[in-house]
Amino acid sequence: MSSPSSDADSAGLFGYEDDQDPVSVKSRTGFVLTLFGCPVIFQSKLQKEVTLSSTAAEYDAFSMAMRELLPMRQLLQEFGDKLGLEVLKTSLVNSTGFEDSQGCISLVNVPKMSSRNKYLQLKYHFFREEIGESKGIVAKYISTLEQKADIFTKGLPQKQFEKIRFLLMGW
């Protein structure tokens, strides 16, 4: 099973994101993709644009994780087909994207757009046709306390850092 976890630190609250611009309000995106529980792809970077809301920042982060997940799923599916590995064929049907923003989950799972979020449609909706139980990727809410991607976007207290490190690395 492949599972992405994505997060965004809205408005650059992580700290001084850009040493050339210490008052930057760009959000920091972070995500980790795991395959059978092991981290295989991770990233932390500033978003290219200033987002208008924390939901938009989280949606951008989810979109970035999907840009990595979709080709990885296709590659593993091809390995399964060529090598006759049933475990790769069946387990990839169950990819779950974990997100700690209810607003983002709502945008991902509900195919309608409103005038308030229509500007997100063109830029980030490339993955929408891949989302759904029948398509193989499901977006689910996860508590901020369990969000693995927080380690890439926030300065965490030691106890929380160690908890997330254990969730990611097992130590």
Segments predicted by a language model, with ranges:
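Divalent metal-binding acidic/histidine catalytic loops
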Residues: 1-171
